[in-house]
């Protein structure tokens, strides 16, 4: 296959596993030092020794007892040397990473602690969450009826859920940023240091060209199964549907295993399916999943056709058409994120009504 984005899959798993850890493993425990909890959560950001660390997804994937995951026991089995801090918009805080990917060099939206970079906010939230899980005091929440109860350890006195904040923030600051503001912005008609067109230049000894690989890495951050158009929205969101599809994955190549690199819905792609399914019976149904996938597939076909010419070349006209597809996919992806934010706002309004 000329398609590969294993590094992106590893990062999808790091984010998903972090959310699972915070929701299901992290508990209020004064006997465990704050710094130990910070280290446990920071692992998912910095990926220290991740190559030999066990993934958690095999525990929480739907119908886990009947699923065999392909080469996914450790993060290194999926892709070696991966982390999130080197891919977050604005860089790693030490001058490295994606320092040029913070649009206009400006980060705003969170006043507490005055974080100057996204990574600063991530570290701040980890510290806050660790302290919250170590203070021995349960957060009490009061619902719209006046009833009170102890909140989950992720929730602070202001009602802020750090698991949700971390997961959704990283999906934007890493996945959406990298997908749309990095890989999809590759100069696909450029040339390498040897003067070879990117559409013709092999990426090392791999079976794909440089241009194809960069595009596929952008798709990897969206997170859909490669045959995502074969799924219904309810299947992609792992809600219901045909037995072989209803859990958000499908053994497409019939090898008896689920390959997270190609046969599973992560992150943004699953959220798009949720928005589409949730709006299907309303007056203004959305189809974000199709609006993202169709132009991505069309753009990838243009690259494939160009790479397989007798003399590989991406013409100006072909690149212009491909850029139109990339634009449409990126805008639909962003609209899906906005719709998800509105969905949660509506949830809050319903809860307090």
Regions found by a protein language model. Give the residues of each.
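Mature extracytoplasmic or organellar-lumen-exposed domains after removal of signal/transit peptides
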Residues: 1-353
